[in-house]
Amino acid sequence: MIIGIPKEIKNNENRVSLSPSGVHALVEQGHTVIVEKSAGLGSYFEDVDYTEAGASIVNEQAEVWNVDMVMKVKEPLEEEFQYFKEGLILFTYLHLANEEKLTRALLENKVVGIAYETVQLPDRTLPLLTPMSEVAGRMSAQIGAEFLQKYKGGMGILLGGVPGVSKGRVSIIGGGQAGTNAAKIALGLGADVTILDVNPKRLQELEDLFDGRVHTIMSNPLNIEQCVKDSDLVIGAVLIPGAKAPNLVTEDMVKEMRDGAVIVDIAIDQGGIFETTDRISTHDDPTYKKHGVVHYAVANMPGAVPRTSTIALNNATLPYAQQLASKGYLKALQDNHALSLGLNTINGELTNKGVAEALNLSYTDIESALK
């Protein structure tokens, strides 16, 4: 199979979908890998690193898309839609529930769209989303601490406090991978941390994991309202695989927060959980204020730490890429149920129910689509 690795064009997206070691593994299996010039530079991989691993370097974006399978990091932008073609395998983060134009373009061009974020193991874990959730979660606490500084627009609070001064209060909505990793860093910074989740069993697991050092509270509108009001930093870390993120924090709740408090919405790439994060920000211009509250709503947070993120992503995606390349997408999807759950579009049909509901489009179940 011929596999293309484009250079990411999203604002300050410095990750690349495969490291040279990943390329080498595919080439060793007999596949051809084409890498767009400078695709790895943001992650400190030189073109020569890829050629030594067995890849070919091309100058034109069109060349790297004229392949059997394209591996990316982030969803294609509109200027890349022109390269879609029937039967092209697109293996990347798609987040289609918040991307109607992209969804329609994939369907119209009969692209085989396989989303990293909806590949799901029998225990319901998301192996290709987990590494980036870990990165984004850890970053969220660091970013929140940064923007609480006065010169960054915050209220001038040190999360860890000092002797005689109260710690900063952090509320994390969602106790999954991102929320758990946010809590680890927030605790490390010395903050007073509360985690809200809808699953009592998960709350018990978090109590045990953190040895009682975090407050765990059932997530419901009343508890969310109270925690949001009392917090200096609120982190949104809720995920429903494939579906649009639920709107859990209303504008009225945000209005009750103190001036200079900070919101970090990790779920913004799926629409966000805050009513007031109504637009996506960028690494160039990461925050905006509403009702005196600093909002951080960057959809590609791990792109700011590309070396770590690229290697972690490569480690997770490579085994699945090898299956797709060696077996072809149809047999690979039929043989691997976890991978088949990543299938979002095929032959002009939408195969993710959460996306179909979010965009009010017709849905075809995966089993029928693969017959």
UniProtKB/Swiss-Prot annotation:
Gene Ontology terms: cellular component: cytosol; plasma membrane
Binding site for NAD(+): 133, 177-178, 197, 219, 238-239, 266-269, 279, 298-301
Source taxonomy: Bacteria, Bacillati, Bacillota, Bacilli, Bacillales
Pfam families listed in its UniProt record: AlaDh_PNT_C, AlaDh_PNT_N
Organism: Staphylococcus saprophyticus subsp. saprophyticus (strain ATCC 15305 / DSM 20229 / NCIMB 8711 / NCTC 7292 / S-41)
Family: Belongs to the AlaDH/PNT family.
Name used for this protein in its record: Alanine dehydrogenase
UniProt entry keywords in alphabetical sequence: NAD, Nucleotide-binding, Oxidoreductase
Pathway: Amino-acid degradation; L-alanine degradation via dehydrogenase pathway; NH(3) and pyruvate from L-alanine: step 1/1
Function: Catalyzes the reversible reductive amination of pyruvate to L-alanine. May play a role in cell wall synthesis as L-alanine is an important constituent of the peptidoglycan layer.
Annotated active site: H95 (proton donor/acceptor), D269 (proton donor/acceptor)
Gene Ontology BP annotations: alanine catabolic process; L-alanine catabolic process
Protein EC: 1.4.1.1
Top-level taxon in the UniProt lineage: Bacteria
Record CDD domains: L-AlaDH (cd05305)
Subunit field text: Homohexamer. Trimer of dimer.
Binding site for substrate: R15, K74
Gene coding for it: ald
Catalytic activity: L-alanine + NAD(+) + H2O = pyruvate + NH4(+) + NADH + H(+)
GO molecular function: alanine dehydrogenase activity; nucleotide binding
